[in-house]
Amino acid sequence: MVRILCDLIRWYQQGISAQRPFRVCRFTPSCSQYMLEALQRFGLKGILLGSWRLLRCQPFSRGGYDPVPNHFTFRRQG
C-alpha cells in the first residue's frame, strides 16, 4: 500500500506539479515531498503527518522550512 501511494505521489510530482510555471507550496520541502518522506519513514502513519502538513499549507500560513520529524509525533518541535 505504501509503495502504491509513493508511486502516486511521484506521478503527481513529475506529471502535474512539474507543469506548473511557479511554485505553489509555502513550505520546504514541498508538501508532496514531505508526504513521500513521511510515508517512507513511518509507513501508513506517515499519511497522518502528510495530511496535517496539507492542512497547514494555506495562504495564512507563514510556511518555511518544515522537515519530516525523526520520530512520529504530532507535538510541535522547537
Swiss-Prot record:
The lineage of its organism: Bacteria, Bacillati, Bacillota, Bacilli, Lactobacillales. Could be involved in insertion of integral membrane proteins into the membrane. Belongs to the UPF0161 family. It comes from the Bacteria. Pfam families: YidD (PF01809). InterPro entries: Membr_insert_effic_factor_YidD. It is a peripheral membrane protein. Keywords: Cell membrane, Membrane. NCBIfam families: membrane protein insertion efficiency factor YidD (TIGR00278). It comes from Limosilactobacillus reuteri (strain DSM 20016) (Lactobacillus reuteri). Its main location: membrane. The keyword Membrane applies. It is found in: Cell membrane. This is Putative membrane protein insertion efficiency factor. PANTHER family: MEMBRANE PROTEIN INSERTION EFFICIENCY FACTOR-RELATED (PTHR33383:SF1). GO terms for cellular component: plasma membrane. Coiled coil: none annotated.
